[in-house]
Amino acid sequence: MLSVGGGRSAVCRAVIATSIVWLLIDVVILFYYLDPSTSQQQPFPEDNRILNRARRIEPLPPAAQHDSDPDAHPIQPEKQEKQVYPVDKETANQLRKLMETQAFGPGYHGQGGTGVTVPEDKKTIKEKRFLENQFNVVASEMISVNRTLPDYRSDACRTSGNNLKTAGMPKTSIIIVFHNEAWTTLLRTLHSVINRSPRHLLEEIILVDDKSDRDYLVKPLDSYIKMFPIPIHLVHLENRSGLIRARLTGSEMAKGKILLFLDAHVEVTDGWLEPLVSRVAEDRKRVVAPIIDVISDDTFEYVTASETTWGGFNWHLNFRWYAVPKRELNRRGSDRSMPIQTPTIAGGLFAIDKQFFYDIGSYDEGMQVWGGENLEISFRVWMCGGSLEIHPCSRVGHVFRKQTPYTFPGGTAKVIHHNAARTAEVWMDEYKAFFYKMVPAARNVEAGDVSERKKLRETLQCKSFKWYLENIYPEAPLPADFRSLGAIVNRFTEKCVDTNGKKDGQAPGIQACHGAGGNQAWSLTGKGEIRSDDLCLSSGHVYQIGSELKLERCSVSKINVKHVFVFDDQAGTLLHKKTGKCVTGADQRVTLDECGLGRKDQMWQLEGYQSP
């Protein structure tokens, strides 16, 4: 006969075992519907304890079933329900709590990429939890991890996709780095990749956990990913390493011939993978990025981005989106499915041949945490024999945050300046002066030893940065040909022309010279523009004697005649070519006035000026 204590113990063990079994059944049922060999329309059983609110689950049909190549067959995964994965009590409870609030089916908010509005009674918790990841976690939890999205591709891209033969293409390892990512955004990333990717093109997904401190990203995630129908590897880094080193960890593990880096809060769309893989397979020195659409950080609405934008950068070495210039549009012609050759990529999402990635030096391991690595690899690829493309037929939505939720050792600015300085020192030659003039604080940041990276550049016989500006990015805010760089100083008052932090359409001013660059950093280009980053001094739309000069966005292709000046170094005058008037510094204003011989308010010195 069992004792009372022993009986209770046996009952407890039975209850725990039953709970774990039910959890495994629940998860198995979920992933049964991710198996392409199963029906896509069957309802979940009525007694499904976790998903009983979603009476009918209709996961997105895997892209493998609609492969454009009739001879290509998806890899059939083993029947997941035949496998048993041990789950301890604590992990089982964590998974149950996570999945009770998790939406799987199509009957939830946000379908078709629409946004969601958080109910009034949840506004307080929404605002509190927004700080967790700097996006609306509550809204994300209201949206199915299998949410539907329209086919956003152009007709030309659909036609191109239907004609694309993917049989025999190399397999891809998808690498996703995360740190304290929200559960639902990470899962939505995984589900969308698996639902919308041909299985025969996927070698594996590699998740690199950069020292997260949230419990659900350890054992619960380990257990969850084992049920997916493709190999998913999860590595937990022992120390916070940053995006760059974490990606290197993932790339070293990768078995695929192509590496495809993704962020942890994205949603891929129909036909996203095939164009990227095909372009890299065609030329192993191509690096190809998708169009990056916007997922609202508040409502999670999916908003498509323009097909005619490309990546650039400014004097701060910040990545920027700009309109594709006419010369590139002309090269592409009327074919909307043709990739855009871009000077830089955003860096979060791109595909690259694995061997080429290592041949050209992978990532600069001297960089810290995150920031600037995208410009460094962009310059390196172009200057060392490769090319960069944005493919309009591949679209991936990305949750863009207004600020990072993460902390940086020594502060964000220090890390960003450190990384940018390494890029400037290794790749930008004499043009690094533009960065240091615009960001004087970077002069005080230690860039570290860059000798190995310079040796790499020499070994690869990479081209000069001037070549890059002249041949790849002639529209860059950094002029390939310039006459001066620095302050514009009145020779008698010793005061400087200053942007005063003004923007397009506003007027600069005159301030005491501080010698630190920044707002007082100007360049007289070989074409006669007076630039401060991507803003040019201009006579403005309406000119009259004594009117103030304006700041205007510099022209991308053809020089605007309103922006052209002629400097006489001997007389010190800056003549506005169109009006024939001289730049005049009166009080705190910068104006155009009648030129007068010996007028002290019209005598200027341009720092670093070199005559043509």
Curated annotation (Swiss-Prot):
EC number: 2.4.1.41
Function according to Swiss-Prot or TrEMBL: Catalyzes the initial reaction in O-linked oligosaccharide biosynthesis, the transfer of an N-acetyl-D-galactosamine residue to a serine or threonine residue on the protein receptor.
Taxonomic source organism: Caenorhabditis elegans
GO CC aspect terms: Golgi apparatus; Golgi membrane
Catalytic reaction(s) noted: L-seryl-[protein] + UDP-N-acetyl-alpha-D-galactosamine = a 3-O-[N-acetyl-alpha-D-galactosaminyl]-L-seryl-[protein] + UDP + H(+); L-threonyl-[protein] + UDP-N-acetyl-alpha-D-galactosamine = a 3-O-[N-acetyl-alpha-D-galactosaminyl]-L-threonyl-[protein] + UDP + H(+)
Stretches of the chain found on the membrane's Lumenal side: 35-612
Entry annotated with the keyword Glycoprotein: yes
Residues annotated as binding substrate: 210, 240, 370, 401, 406
Domain comment quoted from the record: There are two conserved domains in the glycosyltransferase region: the N-terminal domain (domain A, also called GT1 motif), which is probably involved in manganese coordination and substrate binding and the C-terminal domain (domain B, also called Gal/GalNAc-T motif), which is probably involved in catalytic reaction and UDP-Gal binding.
UniProt-annotated glycosylation sites, renumbered to this chain: 146, 239
Disulfide bonds: 157-393, 384-462, 496-513, 536-554, 582-595
PROSITE patterns named in the record: RICIN_B_LECTIN
Protein name as it appears in the record: Polypeptide N-acetylgalactosaminyltransferase 3
